[in-house]
Regions:
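Sec-dependent N-terminal signal peptides
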Residues: 1-7
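C-terminal motif of bacterial Sec signal peptides marking the signal peptidase cleavage site
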Residues: 10-12
Length: 455
């Protein structure tokens, strides 16, 4: 017979202790959360009969016609210097062809699987031809790829195409729309039959008219894992996930399994609410190795968008920045505190200061912007002048020494400095400094970030 002391010695010597059901529940939730958030986002975004500027039936593109404002609630932390084009696809019955024009500006396509991993990045400015076509298929596709079309395999049946096209100002929107009009999507069968113009109608369900993250947060434990298990069946995990999938199967979470919240007893829903309320904080703690810190700023570094088995990191991003790019395309330094370590507050006034020659370094067609968000919900803040960011195209006034000051406050500064004003209104807010197509010094965290000083 093994004594308790001996068992303790075994654990201390590296024999792993068996996980409790509560620990497995956390692992299962973290593993499946991006999949469930993606599914909710897809349901909301395809909940329409015909194409609009915010929704389209499955496998069809829809294009935002304007930059995001405070009314935009579909995706957290929306950027306000690119216009989105999107397509939520389902490859379970047929492949999907995406048709794109060559551009002379930043117009980058991020293709994600159902777990929100970026499986392909397409830069339209790099095209050799005026039009390029891409065929998206499941990994087990055995059909023919038409000549002149590039095949991209997706490990899951469902996925998300997110296209960001830079828009310099309100007058530039007409040029962005001209680019959007040259984009198209249609099934492989439609292409082969020469019937690419037909766009099947979708279905509207009033029950799918929700804010995705809030919808997921409102699910019961049973409803959540019923949905997760079905999604795992439709979008099977990869071989890299085998260890985790085998582990969480012990509480019947996995493809073709039947979950029963009764295994957690009468306190199941209390446990679930506690988990829902703490998961973002726990995932952030687990992801510190990927957090790059520089001055009062920090940003999500690699492997963002190319998560591999960094499940807690992937879950965190699904809550705070769904659809984020890999660092090769963009980095997003975030500031919640000023340079003295004090929490940013809407009742204070701040100066964000770039030294001369220390504006964010970017590659050709790259750009940068500073955007403010309400920390209570990660959305833009309403303001009287409808200004949500300052960017490298803004009409700002530089200091005599060539440095740049951005004034972050609720009330406007002096008239001559209003072009440098970024309005804020929330009790607590944070800033995101987006840098698209960053130079290597940014990716390597060697570029000096701007200071944020209280006035």
């Amino acid at each position: 017979m093994l004594t308790a002391a001996f068992l303790g010695t075994m654990v201390g010597c590296g024999v792993p202790a068996k996980q409790t059901n509560e620990e497995l529940l956390y692992d299962a939730f973290v593993y499946t959360l991006p999949l469930v958030v993606f599914d909710a986002t897809m349901k909301k975004s395809t909940n329409t009969v015909t194409v609009t500027d915010q929704q389209a039936p499955v496998n069809q593109l829809f294009h935002a016609k304007n930059l995001a404002t405070a009314e935009f609630k579909d995706v957290v932390t929306p950027n306000v210097d690119t216009v989105y084009s999107q397509c939520f696809f389902d490859l379970s019955e047929d492949g999907l062809i995406l048709e794109l024009p060559k551009t002379e500006r930043f117009c980058v396509v991020e293709v994600m699987d159902a777990f929100t991993n970026a499986i392909s990045i397409i830069d339209t400015a790099s095209f050799e031809k005026d039009t390029e076509r891409f065929l998206f298929v499941k990994s087990d596709f055995s059909g023919q790829t038409p000549d002149g079309i590039k095949k991209i395999e997706c490990p899951t049946a469902k996925g998300w195409i997110l296209i960001r096209t830079i828009c310099n100002d309100a007058e530039d929107i007409v040029n962005v729309r001209a680019i959007q009009e040259k984009m198209d999507s249609y099934t492989l069968m439609q292409y082969v039959s020469g019937n690419t113009e037909e766009k099947p109608e979708g279905v509207y369900d009033p029950n799918n008219n929700f804010i995705p993250v809030q919808y997921v947060q409102g699910l019961s434990m049973q409803a959540y894992f019923d949905k997760a298990n079905q999604l795992l069946k439709d979008n099977p995990p990869t071989k890299d996930d085998e260890k985790t999938v085998k582990s969480i199967a012990r509480i019947n979470v996995g493809p073709s399994l039947t979950f029963d919240s009764a295994i957690f007893g009468d306190g199941a829903e209390t446990l679930w609410k506690e988990l829902m309320g703490s998961v973002a904080k726990k995932c952030l703690q687990s992801s510190q190795a990927y957090m790059m810190k520089n001055g009062c700023w920090s940003y999500y570094g690699a492997p963002i968008a190319e998560f591999g088995t960094a499940y807690a990191y992937r879950a965190l991003i699904s809550l705070v920045g769904l659809g984020a790019n890999p660092v090769s395309v963009a980095v997003y330094p975030k500031a919640e505190y000023d340079s003295d370590g004090v929490r940013l507050s809407g009742d204070q006034q701040y100066v964000l200061h770039f030294e001369k020659d220390e504006l964010p370094p970017v590659q050709e067609n790259g750009f940068w912007s500073v955007t403010a968000y309400d920390s209570s919900n990660n959305f833009l803040m309403d303001n009287a002048i409808d200004r949500y960011c300052i960017n490298d195209r803004s009409e700002v006034v530089y200091n005599e020494d060539g440095s740049l000051d951005i004034y972050i406050q609720s009330e406007p500064p002096a008239d001559e400095l209003r072009g440098n004003w970024l309005p804020v209104s929330a009790e607590q807010f944070h800033l995101i400094l987006r840098i698209y197509l960053p130079e290597g010094s940014v990716v390597a965290n060697e570029w000096p970030t701007p200071s944020i000083a209280k006035k």
